């Protein structure tokens, strides 16, 4: 699930 991992990272980066 690389897509899910990337999505979580992107969501975290946007939250920061």
From Swiss-Prot:
- Top-level taxon of origin: Bacteria
Query: What keywords sit in the KW lines?
Result: Ribonucleoprotein, Ribosomal protein, RNA-binding, rRNA-binding
Any one cellular component term from GO for this entry? ribonucleoprotein complex
Q: Which GO terms describe its molecular function?
A: rRNA binding
Family listed = Belongs to the universal ribosomal protein uL6 family.
What is the role of this chain? Answer: This protein binds to the 23S rRNA, and is important in its secondary structure. It is located near the subunit interface in the base of the L7/L12 stalk, and near the tRNA binding site of the peptidyltransferase center.
Q: How does it assemble?
A: Part of the 50S ribosomal subunit.
State the protein's name.
Large ribosomal subunit protein uL6
Lineage here is: Bacteria, Pseudomonadati, Pseudomonadota, Gammaproteobacteria, Vibrionales
**Coding gene?**
rplF
